[in-house]
């Protein structure tokens, strides 16, 4: 179990990265799976229709973020077909193809996500 201070720092890192995220998918290792939050989760749902975002509630911080969870097997298949910019044992950063950025903004405004 992580100390409370570390959990707060991790959530702050996620929020800081996601606030104006228009071109990346940030993935975080959580136990035996990976998670994408907020704009990263929306990017995943746009690029890969098999992913579904859900509202993840952080009661201690009174915040709700969109979230997509991926198994290790899913992440292996996903990474084969994407451009991983940064990969570490507990985090990944994936660039969104330039040609998809404008399509994403249109999709997002159409579906209100």
Each predicted region: which residue ranges?
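Basic, polar low-complexity surface loops/patches
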Residues: 2-113
């Amino acid at each position: 179990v992580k100390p409370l201070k570390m959990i707060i720092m991790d959530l702050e890192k996620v929020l800081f990265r996601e606030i104006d995220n228009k071109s990346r998918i940030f993935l975080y290792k959580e136990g035996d799976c990976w998670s994408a939050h907020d704009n990263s989760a929306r990017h995943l749902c746009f690029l890969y229709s098999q992913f579904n975002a859900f509202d993840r509630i952080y009661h201690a911080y009174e915040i709700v973020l969109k979230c997509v969870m991926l198994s290790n097997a899913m992440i292996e298949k996903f990474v084969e077909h994407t451009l991983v910019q940064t990969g570490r044992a507990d985090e990944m950063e994936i660039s969104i193809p330039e040609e998809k950025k404008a399509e994403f903004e249109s999709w997002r405004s159409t579906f209100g996500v």
